[in-house]
């Protein structure tokens, strides 16, 4: 789906079992991919996960037209078309918790083991952010340890809210502590806002509400003091920071006025924005990217496609906009497309990562 318009053009087809000579079938050999892009915002939709969505009544998750088709061979071909060397996969909204705790725990394990299988099957082409069964908090920590320590996940993904648990919720503290202790990464992805029944249903929620939801949740993360308590924690915010870049001054102006006596020093949104990491999925050129560059650290910007929810041909056009924009010089553009991701995830510097 194109996040800007809500348009979705699903591709159907069951998962194909790869052949042993798939590197030849899929185009570029490893040594030819050294200059390829690293896509920090890509999704996978294994058939068993699609079936779980359908069984949970999520035929149109977040109001989109349909669940997009996905299989690993098509994904690799589209990555070649996009000049993507490595895609870091994650499960998108609505995640794995549909109301049944046991099912959520089992499904999180299943999608994480599938992510690890893809990484092992295609060295250098895939990484993955592990899914957790939040708000099953104890089980989420167990799954985090298994995914990071055993499966070798590149980090974890947290939805902007998971059944009403936003990123600043104190119950997430054990998860943040585990991630920070491993110098790992939290990738956050928007989902339907909690209480969405009170919102207008006229438009697919990814078009507008996802941007507001990311803004709401990351602001909660900042204002709850998580960056101060875990300074080594690396949070990747999608879609060029949503509305946060243009709200920094307002937050920093009003927060001291609204803080109660005894609450301590108010956190600085502007300082936090320099600490946060941002992918450029969606349509950030020109206005949103200009605003983001005014407040973010350029060394913490990353390419993201949002494939397959953004169709491959739309991904190509959006990447071309990033190639052409005068807001990025050649050095910053190269860093955004691959260098910054190598610094964030050092294992990607290996040709057989």
Regions found by a protein language model. Give the residues of each.
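Catalytic metal-binding/acid-base residues of hydrolase active sites
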Residues: 43, 191-192, 241, 308
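Mid-to-C-terminal alpha-helical segments outside catalytic/metal-binding sites
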Residues: 2, 6-11, 16-40, 45-86, ...
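Active-site gating/metal-coordination segments in enzymes
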Residues: 20, 85, 90-224
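Active-site gating loops and adjacent loop-to-helix segments of metal-dependent hydrolytic enzymes
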Residues: 23, 32-34, 43-70, 100, ...
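Acidic-and-aromatic substrate-binding clefts and catalytic sites of carbohydrate-active enzymes
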Residues: 65-70, 96-97, 134-140, 163-170, ...
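Conserved N-terminal glycine/acidic-rich loop preference
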Residues: 185-188, 192, 212-223, 227, ...
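Hydrophobic faces of well-ordered beta-strands that scaffold small-molecule active sites
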Residues: 38-42, 87-89, 127-130, 156-158, ...
